[in-house]
Amino acid sequence: MVSIWPTVDYRSENFQEMKEKGYLIRTDRGFRIVMDFQGNTVHYDATNPAAREYVWQKAKKNYYDKGIKVFWLDEAEPEYSVYDFDNYRYHIGPNVQVGNIYPALYAKTFFDGMKAEGQENIINLLRCAWAGSQKYGALVWSGDIHSSFSSLRNQLAAGLNMGLAGIPWWTTDIGGFHGGDPKDPKFQELLVRWFEYGTFCPVMRLHGYREPLKEPMGKEGGAACVSGADNEVWSFGEEAYEICKKYLALRESMKPYITCLLYTSPSPRDTR
């Protein structure tokens, strides 16, 4: 699995071509910069069929053809530095009217490309979804949530609501994403409780940006990013580790049951 964002940096070799062909989100006012994380960027316009094909061909050449068959499609809302929805224009209309469809068409970008390659049982991890996203192999997680018991409580409602919306494959960042010191007994308690809950979620996933942060590993690209503290099951003390091992074994024993649910839940096979 590799992580892909829908943002295109001004410095990208593809930026000018995508801009000229209308493959990027437009703005009615101000500079055409919609997000400034790690550079000045604009999202590709997932509502434009030609833009979807263009992005897939780039991903196919650089990842799929080299053996990557699962994608982590982050930033799927999409996220903006300034949420001025009236200012953004998509191929099919203004963001304020059609913006919620973006994550579904982001998922469709990769689903259609992978299906055309003959792949079956397609599933990709996304940070957001919309009605119908299950048609495009969307496995949704609840985003960059805080590491707190109140946040854990919110996941119960979020997961139920996602299921009621017909999107069965859902998960959370066990322990929350933002914060949490692996050596802090209070966080260790939260992590264990969240791990127990995560065992019975459709997908079990340990992920987070732990503290204290580590120094960057390099000066360019992703290596220039600050990394979080260790976040493996053995990172939270021996007592927590023993409990986590118990629940990992339980999850492993549930694989036949989970597989059965996979083939009986709404999926691309029966929601054409």
Q: What are these regions, as identified by a protein language model?
A:
Residues 263-270:
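Conserved small/polar residues in nucleotide/adenosyl-binding loops
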Residues 113, 254, 265:
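A penicillin-recognizing enzyme superfamily signal
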Residues 1-242:
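Aromatic- and carboxylate-enriched substrate-binding clefts and catalytic-loop regions
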Residues 246-262:
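Catalytic cores of secreted or luminal carbohydrate-active enzymes
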